Amino acid sequence: MKFLDQAKIYVRSGNGGAGCVSFRREKFIEFGGPDGGDGGRGGDVIVECVEGLNTLIDYRFQQHFRAKTGTHGMGKNRAGANGADVVLKVPVGTQIFEEDEETLIADMTEVGQRIVLLKGGNGGFGNAYFKSSTNQAPRRANPGLEGQEKTIILRLKLIADAGLVGLPNAGKSTFLAAVSAAKPKIADYPFTTLTPGLGVVTIDTRSFVLADIPGLIEGAHEGAGLGDRFLGHLERCSILIHLVDGTAEDVAEAYHIIRGEIEAYGAGLEDKPEILCLNKMDALSEEEREEKLALLAEESGSEVRLLSGVSGEGVKEVLRLAADEIWKTRAMEKAEAATGEEEEGWKP
């Protein structure tokens, strides 16, 4: 299935049905009085988070969604039926924005989560509603209220615990394939990976989700290469695993390019914990290893892990470090949630 992580769609809720002007007409009843029913309510526009979806491809070919209009009221005090709702099904991790692409309406993070995006218009009152002691035969009824409309942006941000970042051809897909059951396309040329991929990693007794995003190049935040839009999928990650190609001529430059793009993107990515790895160690001699390791450690100012997705060198150590950080983040989030509940307290 083709991957699509952003869609722009137009939605409109249903109009309310009109009320009915009607009078009771029955044999031997001279003044039957008004019996016009009310109109039905228009359908709502609802967004629902469902399991089994990982793309917004359904919204590529259909971008207009309109809920049904409520049925008009009828004689004999018959109210019109409510209009059918429109339910937009989206994958977990979808964010809904206003047309300005900045105002967040909702963040769909749990299966089964539903929000009413637009309410349908109310149905109009029939003439039976307007009967009073001073007006026994009203000849008026209300039209139904208009539905609401708006254009929204759906943006999918994959929910992963850890994310792989690096230049094209840094070995990210090979690493993902080595540590999970995922089967990404692997080839010896840049931009083999064109869309993000997910894999479930199990280390010891712990499991977490690892995201592989397409490679970044210098100027990605300005649209170079595939751009930096895929960095949005890392915003929910607890930790970044930064892979630097050990066979590159200048490992320090490769490191600084990625860090520069992450900082230019912002959104808190630059503050996330990072495991820095010198990858493809199986292709280097002992002398080259030591030289590039020392250079990268000096330039980054942090500890560098030696790694090879092909031979498996250093893989388990990196996964354990990532799992430790993920579990630490989960514990902090749990503690914060518990604190929030205590502060709120019981209310009658």
Swiss-Prot record:
An annotated GO cellular component: cytoplasm
Which terms under GO biological process does the entry name?
ribosome biogenesis
| EC number in record | 3.6.5.-
- Which residues does the annotation say bind GTP? 166-173, 191-195, 212-215, 279-282, 308-310
What SUPFAM superfamilies does the annotation carry?
Obg GTP-binding protein N-terminal domain, P-loop containing nucleoside triphosphate hydrolases
Domain Obg residue range list: 1-159
Main localisation, per the record? cytoplasm
Q: Which GO terms describe its molecular function?
A: GTP binding; GTPase activity; magnesium ion binding
Compartment(s): Cytoplasm
Binding positions for Mg(2+) per the UniProt entry: 173, 193
Q: Where are the transmembrane segments?
A: none
* Keyword terms of this UniProt record: Cytoplasm, GTP-binding, Hydrolase, Magnesium, Metal-binding, Nucleotide-binding
The first-level EC class reads: hydrolase
Tell me where in this chain the OBG-type G domain is found: 160-327
Name what cofactor the protein needs.
Mg(2+)
How it assembles, according to the record, is: Monomer.
Against HAMAP family, the record matches this protein to: GTPase_Obg (MF_01454)
Query: What does the similarity note say?
Result: Belongs to the TRAFAC class OBG-HflX-like GTPase superfamily. OBG GTPase family.
Question: What functional role does this protein have?
Answer: An essential GTPase which binds GTP, GDP and possibly (p)ppGpp with moderate affinity, with high nucleotide exchange rates and a fairly low GTP hydrolysis rate. Plays a role in control of the cell cycle, stress response, ribosome biogenesis and in those bacteria that undergo differentiation, in morphogenesis control.
Which protein is depicted?
Answer: GTPase Obg
Tell me what organism the protein belongs to.
Parvibaculum lavamentivorans (strain DS-1 / DSM 13023 / NCIMB 13966)
The gene that this protein is the product of is obg
